[in-house]
UniProtKB/Swiss-Prot annotation:
This is Glucoamylase ARB_02327-1. It is found in: Secreted. One of its GO terms (molecular function) is glucan 1,4-alpha-glucosidase activity. Belongs to the glycosyl hydrolase 15 family. InterPro entries: 6-hairpin_glycosidase_sf (IPR008928), 6hp_glycosidase-like_sf (IPR012341), Carb-bd-like_fold (IPR013784), CBM20 (IPR002044), GH15-like (IPR011613), Glucoamylase (IPR000165), Glucoamylase_active_site (IPR046966), Glucoamylase_SBD (IPR008291). Its EC number is 3.2.1.3. Its main location: secreted. Residues 1-20 form the signal peptide. Keywords: Allergen, Carbohydrate metabolism, Disulfide bond, Glycoprotein, Glycosidase, Hydrolase, Polysaccharide degradation, Secreted, Signal.
Amino acid sequence: MGLASTVSLALLGLCSLARAQTSAADAYVSAESPIAQAGILANIGPSGSKSHGAASGVIIASPSTSNPDYLYTWTRDAALVSRALVDEFIEGESSLQSVIDSYVSSQQKLQRVDNPSGSYTSGGLGEPKFNIDLTAFTGAWGRPQRDGPALRAITLITYGNHLLSSGNTSYVTDTIWPVVKADLDYVVSYWNQTGFDLWEEVSSSSFFTTAEQHTALRLGATFATAVGASASTYLTQADNVLCFLQSYWNSNGGYATANTGGGRSGIDANTVLTSIHTFDIEAGCDSVTFQPCSDRALSNLKVYVDSFRGLYSINPTGATDPILTGRYKEDVYYNGNPWYLTTFAVAEQLYDALNTWDKLGSLDVTSTSLAFFKQFDSSITAGTYASSTSEYATLTSAIRNWADGFLEVLADFTPADGGLTEQIDKSSGNPTSAADLTWSYASAITAFKARGGAIPASWGAAGLTVPATCSTGGGGGSGGDTVAVTLNVQATTVYGENIYVTGSVNQLANWSPDNAIALNADNYPTWSVTVNLPANTQIEYKYIRKNNGQVTWESDPNRSITTSASGSFTQNDTWR
């Protein structure tokens, strides 16, 4: 029996079905909130009860050391978890300030740890994970991952802006700004280069990464001005990134394509997480920035949820029932299960949308979002519905109940002690994969807060327009059309050794071994990477090995390819 069922069993017999559903969600929020909060704090060093050995301020992904081993700190996870804590601090949880300050200090140190992705000034900020004692993890991994610096910048700027409003300028300018500036400069330099996605599996351009990079640059420009620094570069590149962000939209399918590579459908929780983590209520239902109530984000949400119908035997079977969702339907990791954090994200997007409609006093139904709204009113047509209309009341009430339904199905599969793992077994319903996943706890907190009407700080999304002319210039891009080139190389390696590629164009780091592009070893001994390269261009390149700081180049001569005018192709090589 799930946690909420245990808590609210007596209540359910006293209420109508609709009220019982709400009571179940209420009970789950009430019971799980303190458990999730404690779960986060237990996973933060040095004094967290489940984070023994972690340095001060280090947020571990999970205390699990086997099947899987997640006893590391990921820049992405830590930034998202810290953002949840920062939002709570801003809302009045003053006891969290020391925890947040410790996180800031840990990131100061972590940025300067040399690692397989590079150093502080040569790409090392894109390293995805570190040991919990703030030393480099040197094993094979999907690196670099370029969302981490952007997410960390967003978290620290949000914290810094609040401190500035309270008059604490010296800490912001002396401590927070240098960390933020390094991350923003990394984004400027690398936003138009490929990297691994948030699931650490696909090396390409990623919707989530691009959106977070845009948010970081936009927020960073304002923050730079506030501390007396130059903002022009951040603003210029923010416009370019916003332009690139539009390219992910699949108008035929009605969803945002999660990755430009990977060979999957592109329907992915990546996109739902994008919507909630770039939420800015001041932007209303703007589709350019993929706001939660925008027609594109709502269409995308329906396509994403529907992709899991019939996939997991533990799920309800109704055509519009709230269900458990996973990362993407083709997932095979741990046999491909639903995840807590992805299902919480669905509910959170819906609550964010409801909060925005309440603020606006109306909602719009467009041809893009019509299929989403027809789930709740089959007779609804495109148009604007004021909050005074019966249609508005019908739709928003049904959508709130639907959002609560996702919490209720999560409650059914939350153990009685409230502990949240990474995944839920798709057949048995038992918790599986990493125990006490910090990101799972944070996703519960942010969904619950959104349900209660919490609104995160604005980041400047209101009123943005896509530039008439888009550029990939600045930060390693060369502009013009590109084609996706997959490079495969057969290479046997020793433990700790990784394969990279560099070459004669910016996208291949201009022959820089420090900034060379990492290949992944998912199909070892074949190492692979997909890179967007200039079209109709002759390009020279070589593979290199890196091991304990030592670089070994392939033998001469340089390899050479001539890219096509459009499309994509694969180049198969063997190390020499």
